[in-house]
Amino acid sequence: MGPPLAQELTQACNQPLAATSNLQPDDGYKIELRAENTVDKYPAKQHARRVAAQIRQGKGLIFLMGQKSTLHEDSDQERSLRQRRYFFYLSGVDEADCDLTYDIKTDKLTLYVPDFDLRRAIWMGPTLERKAALQKFDVDEVNYHSSLDEDVKKWAKNQDPGSTIYLLHGSQGPAENPPNVIIDSKALKLAMDACRVIKDEHEIQLIRRANDISAAAHLEILRGITSMSNESHIEGSFLNTCVSLGAHNQAYQIIAASGSNAATLHYSKNNEPLKGRQFVCLDAGAEWNCYASDVTRTFPITHQWPSIEAKQIYQLVQEMQESCIALVKEGVRYLDLHFLAHNILIKGFLTLGIFKGGTLDEVKKSGASLLFFPHGLGHHIGLEVHDVSPQSIMAQGINDDSNNKLILPTCVSPCTTSSPALTSGMVITIEPGIYFSQLALDNAKPEQLKYIDMARVKNYMAVGGVRIEDDILVTKTGHENLTKVPKGDDMLEIIRQGKKGNDSHHV
């Protein structure tokens, strides 16, 4: 790895997170992460104003419920808290049993925290106090939960008949709906989705930190992979690094898929031996202050390419990804990048002899490439790993007849219907992949099989699957890659050097 990227990585990871962890400086990837969050208050009030502007009403009350403390079924053990993301967006509060209201007309954001419970405090520690919460969070007032219903009634009495209370869901409202108000459970979600898709600087910094921690964890695995013998060792190492650096939650379930397991897109058993397998596909991303990272690297269990076929497929996926990333900027239609990735795959497979007997357009129209690349190029990322948007970045335009076969339901998940251009402030993933799935091939359609040389495919089945994924910030002039994990030959060099010197975490 040359000095420029090594320096960039060091700079990105040296932003203050406190509690230093110095991971393997010998290979040029010196990462110093500190676990203390020194970023300013989460901008909840700014978010509330943005949402109100999207609702386009000069008055009304936004009412949002946070996640409640709950027990596992038939158990006295509490479930781990996962805060409701819409609530977090307007509060910055990652604690259970809180609610909020925002009076649009008076611009007043009020947080409601649990009433003091002595027994719970003795067992679990004290809950938020009003004064401490007011200092910690970007809100105008903090009240105890016992006053919430009465406060809503008082608000309603002071409003004109027909005033609106905005809810995320009809089931998440006040205990009693005041008789003189309208309950709207549609407008709020649409408004919040429109706001959440464009990240402000504070949100970008949180996603950046999540990526920096994920980078440290991925690098630690590359340095130690030659001493690991099971997928579970990879998962354990990733979790250990993340938790040591203050990231106690993962943005999604870790995928540590070796060999043919990598052909299963969301494989999660992570319990099989690595011996005799060519590649590991590691899809794993830490969460920081409720914001996700989503990072995938595919690598061999030794410091060299395990076969010529493995090298060919890896380099083809890397070309797909880097070609698409290079074109990311404001105004680009994301779906066109998805089509570009398929075009590169088809050209590559024609060259390798995996596809035969047709032109690029003929193969594309048959849908043959979908057998090997069966998902969309990527998605938004933010408070959810598949973040929300009022419109899908993967939806079909009106003049895409020649590409119809390349659009599957998975391409638009989890969003909805139409496709706008990329906009500055969006954070998206670029994650092409090539998979050799026996299940997919066994269920191929005749028009797809027409262009596939199955004898040639057999030579590639042991590759399993290759996916490479980075998180990309869209800017006015282009993009910024937030993911600082090596690929290709740089990746192999990290594996070759392995662990040198002191590999402990100083946290």
Swiss-Prot record:
Binding site residues for Mn(2+) 1: D294, E431, E469
InterPro entries assigned: Aminopep_P_N, Creatin/AminoP/Spt16_N, Creatinase/aminopeptidase-like, Pept_M24, Peptidase_M24B_aminopep-P_CS, X-Pro_dipept-like
GO terms classed as biological process: proteolysis
Binding-site residues, Mn(2+) 2: D283, D294, E469
Superkingdom of origin organism: Eukaryota
Keyword match Hydrolase: yes
Cofactor note: Binds 2 manganese ions per subunit.
UniProt entry keywords in alphabetical sequence: Aminopeptidase, Hydrolase, Manganese, Metal-binding, Metalloprotease, Protease
Family: Belongs to the peptidase M24B family.
Protein name (Swiss-Prot/TrEMBL): Probable Xaa-Pro aminopeptidase HCBG_01484
